[in-house]
Swiss-Prot record:
InterPro entries: HssA/B-like_chaperone, HssA/B-related. Signal peptide: none annotated. Coiled coil: none annotated. Pfam families: Coiled. One of its GO terms (biological process) is sorocarp development. The gene is hssl62. This is HssA/B-like protein 62. It comes from Dictyostelium discoideum (Social amoeba).
Length: 85
């Protein structure tokens, strides 16, 4: 399945972060060096938001190609969280 992904990074200019996007029935995304990957959400999409180690905040979203977006995003500062749409 084709996945459209949009990644927004709000951080210091010299902050470099790696991101991983994978698809297994649903879409999942992991951001930040100290974050853990979210599992699939049964055909939906999952969002992981993590606060970077140097003070940067990273927000990632993976959306299925049908563009039926259900915006349900939470923000966790100082920890990580997973949300299923």
């Amino acid at each position: 399945m084709t996945i459209l992904s949009a990644i927004t990074s709000i951080s210091r200019p010299n902050k470099i972060s790696k991101s991983v996007v994978s698809s297994n029935g649903g879409a999942s995304l992991s951001m930040g060096s100290n974050s853990v990957a979210c599992g699939g959400c049964g055909g939906g999409s999952s969002v992981l938001i993590a606060a970077g180690g140097s003070g940067g905040l990273f927000v990632g979203a993976a959306v299925a190609v049908d563009l039926s977006i259900h915006a349900s995003v939470g923000i966790a500062i100082g920890s990580t969280s997973c949300h299923c749409n």
